[in-house]
Amino acid sequence: MSNSNTTQETLEIMKESEKKLVEESVNKNKFISKTPSKEEIEKESEDTSLRQETQRRTSNHGHARKRAKSNSKLKLVRSLAVCEESSAPFVDGPLETQDIIQLHISCPSDKEEEKSTKDVSEKEDKDKNKEKVPRRMLSRDSSQEYTDSTGIDLHEFLVNTLKKNPRDRMMLLKLEQEILDFINDNNNQFKKFPQMTSYHRMLLHRVAAYFGMDHNVDQTGKAVIINKTSNTRIPEQRFSEHIKDEKNTEFQQRFILKRDDASMDRDDNQIRVPLQDGRRSKSIEEREEEYQRVRERIFARETGQNGYLNDIRGNREGLSRTSSSRQSSTDSELKSLEPRPWSSTDSDGSVRSMRPPVTKASSFSGISILTRGDSIGSSKGGSAGRISRPGMALGAPEVCNQVTSSQSVRGLLPCTAQQQQQQQQQLPALPPTPQQQPPLNNHMISQADDLSNPFGQMSLSRQGSTEAADPSSALFQPPLISQHPQQTSFIMASTGQPLPTSNYSTSSHAPPTQQVLPPQGYMQPPQQIQVSYYSPGQYPNSNQQYRPLSHPVAYSPQRGQQLPQPSQQPGLQPMMPNQQQAAYQGMIGVQQPQNQGLLSNQRSGMGGQMQGLVVQYTPLPSYQVPVGNDSQNVVQPPFQQPMLVPASQSVQGALPAGGVPVYYSMIPPAQQNGTSPSVGFLQPPGSEQYQMPQSPSPCSPPQMPQQYSGVSPSGPGVVVMQLNVPNGPQPPQNPSMVQWSHCKYYSMDQRGQKPGDLYSPESSPQANTQMSSSPVTSPTQSPAPSPVTSLSNVCTGLSPLPVLTQFPRPGGPAQGDGRYSLLGQPLQYNLSICPPLLHGQSAYSVHQGQSGLKHGNRSKRQALKSASTDLGTTDVVLGRVLEVTDLPEGITRTEADKLFTQLAMSGAKIQWLKDAQGLPGGGGGDNGGTAENGRHSDLAALYTIVAVFPSPLAAQNASLRLNNSVSRFKLRVAKKNYDLRILERASSQ
């Protein structure tokens, strides 16, 4: 009723205001038509006062309406007061004027009243609906409007507490159950809860208020007492319902989120998810391979600007893609034909590359992880199995496949990054027979102009060391494979081991030898000559037996024996004198067609010495590597054969072991003097000789015989491979004899020269020839007796092809290491390195100087002693003992001890050996030198000062650090073998 009254009063006020406006207009007209009189003036004043009063009331009523919208109760009270006051003044005044006004405004006012009535009624209905909604909720469940004494909304508080805190949730559910039981119990009007904490009392107070009960505490103030009241009621929703709702919403939200993630993945599938899926599906080996390719491409781009590398990765990647389809079809077959050492990590059907465990010791100082070379075969198309680690090398291997016109000649060639003058070469597809082979340049993809043709297809890499803490020469893995038509075969490659101090080095892990049996119609299997040598520190005291990675060879010849006939039963007879066989580390493989020979040398560590040599041959005669010369300074064979000679050596730092470097050298035609290609070990006397006659291949053109010579080493030595370069095709001769001989002295300088000045007169060979009266019959050709040449000294007068080069870092000369592979600049004959090896010494050093090979006599050796034995940019430390040289003149022993603090920090023990001859400057002394630990004031020049390091690696690092700095003394490799037991016993006294 109040709302309807208010509406009627408002309409009356509006009508009165309109009447006043009409009266004003009438009065104005009268005032204009008539002259004003006093009565009229008085009426006008009265009308003006009435109008002002009406406007004032109307404005007040307007404010009241605005306030009524916000608060209906206030609107009801004030609107009634305004209506009562405004009704009286409008009655005053003559009735005639009021009637006239009503006549004039009757029509428009009715329309306006209808409109205003509708608007006001709609607004009031909305207000009523707003008021009725909470009132209905209160009638159903008034608990949601309950607040406690502090004004907290109980419903919101309880719901949040139930959802958030699990402990409080249990407490609230318990209290709810107890209160419900109390409400349903008509016998009790109050309930006393046990004493509880203040927080739980607070929860109980709020739950009791939520149920509409009185809640107080007892006299102690720790127990809550609740009483039933008239407002006590049970809420419509139980506490557990809020928890279920929350769980359902959370579950739905999680489900929606998962669905959204899946949809996002589907949406982005076209852009980025293919990369992610590829990443997920790739194995670790494939990821490492991809990483190595990208890393090689990046570093090749950077170093190519500095003149070190020329990256032709387009050809390499193309070959990798084409070879992947061919390789995958025969991997399983090749794997079954591959005899290899057993390892506990191997599985019977595994064709994947095996990754070695990463030990903690191998993660420091650039020590490489050792990988079994025979387990690198990969089942993936383009993978060659490699190890990924920081500071690793540029030349990661790629798989290169070629197919000849008749049959497929397959080789797994590590395609490593080349130096500036050499580019990567792929194995060309060769014609069926050597006689029909066109010139070499027609089969090469790319070759530098200044490279000589015999080694144009040699894939070798060179890399310079960078600025690092202790950098040394980088290690390269250059494979050199000879592969020929009409044979289906795999050429082995070995695992490349980076030097420990190299900042980044080549780590080429190429597949091992995997040979496919020759076709049915062929009588001769492909020949392969493998020289395998091992560092004693590689796998210390390994009981793992060695098995060659090729076809079984016929026999193991003893000293001075001839090869048996081909009809002999194949078998393996390794000769290992008094030592344990070590797991193989590197191999040198030269595969040649139509014949097969295996020459393997296995080396294991016993006291850091090379103790034995395994020589294994096949019954078939070997096939020589012919090279010819068509021009004066460019060596070019009449028919070319690509060769891969992978090799690697590594010495673990904690083991006193010496590596066996390999050097590959070539003799020009004018300087051969009847010599033939040879492979030799530079070792002390007492070597054994193994002979293997060779006969030319029946299907090949006239050739020069080849010969391999070396020793059965008893200490660390150097492997020297030598090739003769004949002027042209030679008439067939009797097979040459492979003989292991000893090289007494081997010295070599390094100096850049022009290609025309490659071979100096000093490199003329000084070789002795001997006659062989035991010819060997070829399977298809009768023998013809002829002399067989052999070298008494392998390294006499050789013009070497350098396979190892050391690069100094910008800060100073870098230090070499006892890990050798076929390295360096094999395609340039102007750089060559080979260290001198003195009799009985356990370590050697390298001297850089003029290009060429010098066979020095006693006087030459004395002249070069100081220069060649001081640690230079290419020195190699193989032992733990270094001599201290270049001390200041006149320094006493006590003063010198103060200079050796840096050595002591490296763990070295200084030994003062009395020089028997009294030579100043740290003379060599002898093995019988006595260690004196007494501190005297005598001169240090009277002693030979020896620093004994805990490991060869520590000695290597110390020599790097001290020789490259402004130290007052230098370290060099010991000239002789010091008895470590005597030195250690002297240091312990």
UniProtKB/Swiss-Prot annotation:
InterPro entries: R3H_dom (IPR001374), R3H_dom_sf (IPR036867), R3H_domain_containing (IPR051937), SUZ (IPR024771)
Pfam families: R3H (PF01424), SUZ (PF12752)
Residue ranges with Pro residues bias: 695-704
Residue span of region Disordered: 23-71, 106-147, 267-288, 306-390, 416-479, 493-524, 674-738, 751-793, 848-867
Signal peptide start-end: none
Localization per record: Nucleus
Bias (Polar residues) ranges: 454-466, 493-517, 761-771
Residue stretches making up the SUZ domain: 233-303
The protein, known as: R3H domain-containing protein 2
Gene name linked to the record: R3HDM2
